[in-house]
């Protein structure tokens, strides 16, 4: 791989101060959190994750825990783009399966809270690898990571999507019963 295309994990990992155009009133979020997250204490800090391209993602710290907020970006968007509601539905549905996902706390479509629809989930400590070749890992670490990835893929394949509420209907794709000759 050319050095021009190497991805530096540190560049995209971790958090930063929230971009000015993505800030929101933490008092309104705090009120929402008190309603949806049991025993939630006051927000002590809000940071924005560095990585990602689509939906702004924040680390919310309180005295009792760390949470992640994913929201639609502000501004004019394509109708089906940035579907945080779909992300929430899938993650929530997988909570009771063998697929490791964070616990979700709620989906909010009230624009008055943070300006756009969002959902909250627990923060899970870990490392994000932006380069799939895992150059910062030893051979042993890479082998373990790939085994874990395969285990999770197998767990996904084992999910009965209908029973967890993720069945998809394709009735809108039916072909005409009579084709022109």
Tell me the role of every PLM-derived stretch:
Residues 2-7, 31, 65, 123, ...:
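Membrane-targeting and insertion segments and their boundary/processing signals
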Residues 3-38:
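Juxta-kinase regulatory segment immediately upstream of eukaryotic protein kinase catalytic domains
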Residues 37-44, 179:
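Secondary-structure boundary/capping signal
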Residues 44-173:
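ATP-binding pocket architecture of kinase catalytic cores
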Residues 172-181:
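Single conserved hydrophobic/aromatic residue that forms the stacking wall/gate
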């Amino acid at each position: 791989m050319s050095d021009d295309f190497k991805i530096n994990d540190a560049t995209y990992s971790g958090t930063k101060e929230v971009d000015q155009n993505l800030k929101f009133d933490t008092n309104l979020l705090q009120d929402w959190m008190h309603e949806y997250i049991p025993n939630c204490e006051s927000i002590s800090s809000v940071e924005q994750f560095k990585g990602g391209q689509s939906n702004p993602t924040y680390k919310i710290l309180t005295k009792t825990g760390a949470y992640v907020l994913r929201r639609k970006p502000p501004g004019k968007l394509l109708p089906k783009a940035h579907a945080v509601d779909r992300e929430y539905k899938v993650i929530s549905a997988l909570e009771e399966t063998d697929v490791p996902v964070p616990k979700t706390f709620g989906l909010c479509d009230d624009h008055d809270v943070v300006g756009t629809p969002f959902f909250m989930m627990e923060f899970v400590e870990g490392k994000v690898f932006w380069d799939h070749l895992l150059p910062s890992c030893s051979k042993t670490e890479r082998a373990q990571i790939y085994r874990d990835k395969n285990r999770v893929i197998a767990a996904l394949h084992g999910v009965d999507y209908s029973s967890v509420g993720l069945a998809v209907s394709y009735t809108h794709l039916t072909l005409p019963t009579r084709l022109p000759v």
